[in-house]
Amino acid sequence: MRGNDASRLPLRGVRALELAEIWAGPFCGSLLGDLGAEVIKVESIQRVARGAVNPGPGAAGYAGGEPGERPWNRFANFNALSRNKLGVTLDLTSPQGVRVFAELANLSDVVFTNYAFGVMESFGLGYEALKRIKPDLVVVFMPGYGNTGPYKRYRSMGMTIDAITGHSALRGYPDLDLSSLTMVHHPDAVGGITAVVAVCTALYQRARTGRGAFIDISQAEAFMPHMGEIFLEHSMTGQDSERRGNRHPSMSPHGCYPCLGEDRWVTIAVRTDEEWQALREVTGMAADSRFSTAESRLAHEDELDALVAAWTSSLDRHEATRKLQARGIPAAPVLDCGPDTYDDPHLQERGYFEEVTHPDAGTHVLSGPIWRLAGVEGPVQRPAPCLGEHNRHVLRDILGMPESAMSRLEEQDIIGTVPLQGSDMGGVRRVARQGRARTKTRARASSPQPPRRG
C-alpha cells in the first residue's frame, strides 16, 4: 500500500453484497472497496452482464479488440468497475441459490443493488425478506426512478435518466438538435457516489442505534440537484433555460478555444473584472469599451470569443494554460481519455493511475481511488474477479460449506465459472444472429477454468 496500512481503511471489517451491473451500482461497489469494505459481487452463469458472451473479433471493449477464450473475463468496462471485489455466482431464480444468498446476507452488513424495481422481490429477496434474515442490514435499492411513484417500473439507462431529468435539453450547442448528445452519461456516476454516501451514513447510524436501514435511491433524483439553478431560474421567471454550449450566463469569456495543432483546445473561464484585466494583459488585447463590464462582454460574446481565439490559436494548449494560470485565470487544456491523461504530469505525480494485472485481461492501467485519506490511501488491492472466481473461497471459508455441497451446486448450475448458452443480456438473439451458438458442454470443454487467487 505504498507504505500505508490497509487495515486502517475506514470500512475495514464491513462486508457488502453487490447485485449490480453496468455503471451506477458497480461504481458504488468499487468505491466501497476502495474504502476498505469486503465487497462480494454476486452474479450468475444464467445471465451474465459482462459484455457479450460470444463477441466477434475486433469487438469494442476488449484489449486490442481481441475477446479471447473467456471474453466474459476480459470486458474493459466490467474490469474497470470491479476492482477490489470478490466474485461469486448464484442462480437466484432457484431456491438453493436464494438460500445460499440468505446465509451470506446474514453474515454481511450491506446489500445494495441497482436492479430494476421488483427484481429483488422476484427472487424473494425484497427488503422485508432481507430484514427478517438480518434486522440490522443496511439495504440500498437504487433503480432509475426509485421504489415508489408512477415511474417505478420503468427501465432505465444513463441516457434515459439524462433525458427525463432535463439534462439532455441543456447539453450541447444551441444550433444542434437534441439528437447530438454524447454517450457520456453523468447520472450513473452520481448515483454510485450517492449510494456510497448513503451507505456510510447508515452504517454510522447503525453503530449509534443498532438499527439497520432501507435506503431508496432514485438515480434520477440523485442527479437533479446538479441542475438546481436551472429549476430555481424557472420558478422565478417561468422561462425555460436555453442550451448555451460552452458559454455561461454570467461569465465571459467562457469557452473552449483552438490552439496550435490539429484539434487542440484550451478552456478559459473569466469570472471577474480583475480576471478580465489580467486576460487583457496576458493577451495584449487593446482596451475596448465593448468589453469593459461583465454585461457588455456578454452582449458582445461573438466578437470577444474571436479575439481570444486569435490569441490561443498561436499557442500550444499547455503553454496557453500556463500563461493564464500564472495570472490566476481558470484555464485547462482539453485532454483525450488516453495518452494525454495517462501521461499528464500532474496525474502521474499524484499516482492516480495504477497498473493492474488480471489473469485473463492482462496488465493495464486503471484509474485509482477518487479520494485520499491521509496515511491510509488504498490503491487497488486486487483486480476484478473472473466469473465465479471466489465461489469456493466465499462458500467454504465464509459460509463453512463442505466440498460435497459445493460440488452439488456446480452440478445443478447454481454456481459456476462459465456462462450458460445465451446467458448474456440479449445473448440468445445475438448468438443466433451471429451464427456462433455454442452448447454449454462445448464451451466448458474449450474454455479452461480461470486461475484462482487466494
Residue spans for each PLM region:
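Conserved Rossmann-fold dehydrogenase catalytic segment
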Residues: 147, 176-185, 207-223, 243-247, ...
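A short glycine-threonine-serine/GTX helix/turn-capping micro-motif
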Residues: 179-190, 214, 244-245, 252-254, ...
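A glycine-rich dinucleotide-binding beta-alpha-beta segment and adjacent secondary-structure elements
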Residues: 325-381, 429-433
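Oxidoreductase and adenylate-handling cofactor-binding alpha/beta cores
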Residues: 192-213, 225, 229-237, 280-286
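Aromatic-enriched alpha-helical interface/lid elements that frame and gate functional surfaces
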Residues: 253-331
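Glycine-rich beta-alpha junction loops
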Residues: 46, 145-146, 219-224, 261, ...
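Short Gly/Pro-enriched turn/cap motifs at secondary-structure boundaries
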Residues: 69-70, 78, 241-249, 256, ...
